[in-house]
């Protein structure tokens, strides 16, 4: 890894993305932080704001980029900014995503289904399209990293969230294929699979199931508690570093035991 490694993070304005930015910055990484920084009509909850993104960028001494991760030219531009400003790219971290549902699979309409695939898996592919060429520009022996956030819902079936669950399963398949393609170049691709994590997305999940509190999800975890965003960020940060060099194509749970049984 270079002395001043460089990463692009999507969904960086809050939650797991912001926590990852904080950890990577503390480890000496130079960062380009991408976020929509505005609400999305496809998602039933408020998203982060420009002020949120700017606050993360200031705290991390990173560069804030307001962009919709569904916009391929915007993502390519963010990666280009990292290369131009910092001299290259060592890691791409795909955190941006969303959750919506509330209907059984056969009553889910086309728009709702397509939205989940778009915001959860197509955006990971779009980041790979933008970032992998830059990762491969590093000289050999290179140690590039591509990390995506899947979900415990990417290994389990979740009622009333078929589109979300299908999209997160698709992230797993994509990452494993990407790992097979990148292996000969010395670049790894891995996914993390968080359980119920204390973020705004969990509030939306509670609404889907009619729960009075997100704490009710803790009963599905062997540890009896929710996952903290910083705990997911800790694993992402490790996957971006040199100690994870022999791991690729893996899906690593950070779920307090949600998928243990």
Label for each model-derived stretch:
Residues 133, 180-184, 245:
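Alpha-helical segment proximal to the catalytic Tyr-Lys
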Residues 151:
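Residue(s) in the substrate-gating loop at a strand-loop-helix junction
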Residues 128, 167, 175:
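Active-site helix of classical SDR
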Residues 143, 183, 188, 247-249:
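Short, small/polar-rich loop/turn modules that mediate ligand/substrate recognition or access, typified
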Residues 103-105, 109-117, 217:
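Substrate-binding pocket helix/loop in short-chain dehydrogenase/reductase
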Residues 2-86, 100-101, 204:
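Short-chain dehydrogenase/reductase
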Residues 102, 156, 223-225, 237, ...:
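Short C-terminal tail/terminal secondary-structure segment
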